Amino acid sequence: MTSITKWIEEYRITEVECLMPDITGNARGKVMPASKFEREEMKLPEGILIQAVHGEWSDDYWELVDPTDRDMIMRPDPDTLCLVPWWDQEPAAQVIHDAYTPEGELHPLAVRSVLRRVLKRYEELGLRPVVAPEVEFYLVAKESNPDFELKPPIGRSGRPETARQSYSIDAVNEFDPVFELMYDYCEAQGIDVDALIHESGAAQMEINFLHGDALRAADQVFMFKRIMREAAMRHDIYATFMAKPMKNEPGSALHFHQSLLSVETGENVFSDEDGEETELFHHYIAGLQKYSPALMPFFAPNVNSYRRIAPEISAPTSLHWGYDNRTVGLRVPLSGPEARRIENRFPGADANPYLAIAATLTAGLLGMEEKLKTTDAYVGNAYDEP
């Protein structure tokens, strides 16, 4: 806590948001006075780990956690400490916590623990996953009645979008004040934004993140969703990460580009010395092909998630892989050997980034361990298949 305490004193922090991503990807925790945060260990009841998005608990509650609903010990990760830029009154900080059992072990059900276990497996093999997320979302008008359909908000022109505006700069600029504030918030929290894109839907946007450490990538998606919602609400609109918020508009995805580096050499193990594809590259893809069906609850965790998965709207409906082909579930973008990677297009924007990354890395790992073989790369429109 020494480095955290010094940082809190340097920035004259008065309040600390002590966060833990739950199983749904939402933030749970406590807001504590800085003085209390520095001197007291935070605890949370174990049952919080399995609270559903609607506030209820699993029918298997007593089989998953201790029946006494005992406390977990929450320990802050110093690497996630940052300012909360939307606190207007006094300087505030936020920090993501890891959950530990009373016996001192990382809690097995905490989503950061799940991802850490997968990354440990890779570390034992001398490999380091590199992940670059792409998250899509909609800006929508505020609506107090939950039974009414969501609608695009009014932009600077005084009217809502009514047509498809893929990659339109002017359509993005309709909400320029929102995104300027978003960029300010991202800078304050150290979020590595690579690009902002207008997607196919009305007021649908996409944010690309720089590639990097897998746990850091999950943290950034988790933090960004809070940032985007806060920036939107400051302008009296809302940002939704539902997979399919509007019936007649495309769904929102959370794509993950992934590659593997050798810890020893730092080189991409998906490419050999001649720049050609390696066997590991194909084993990894084959693992995703074999295990993705079983992992769909991590990629599509809600009923609404499956409304997104339909032909002709850039959502995958097959396990095919292909080169620069957006109709397949596993796309290999055009790149040089050093950037050879696989894009998993199955997850929706509503997926928990920690669990979705853990799932996709696990599938690839099993493919390599079992030396699975891929199908041939798909050529053409995969939606043409029945």
Q: Which residues are covered by each model-predicted region?
A:
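Short, hydrophobic beta-strand segments
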Residues: 95-101, 205-211, 258, 344
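ATP/Mg2+-dependent ligation/transfer catalytic cores
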Residues: 1-193, 217, 355
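Short, solvent-exposed loop/turn elements at beta->coil junctions and helix N-caps
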Residues: 243-248
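Short, conserved phosphate-binding/catalytic loop or strand-edge motifs used
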Residues: 135, 199-207
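Short beta-strand elements
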Residues: 148-157, 254-262, 319-321, 328-334
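A short, glycine/Asx- and small/polar-enriched loop/turn
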Residues: 203-205, 250-256
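Accessory "access/gating" subregions that flank catalytic or transport cores
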Residues: 166, 171-175, 179-193, 207-214, ...
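Catalytic-core signal marking the mid-to-C-terminal active-site face
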Residues: 230-231, 237-238, 263-386
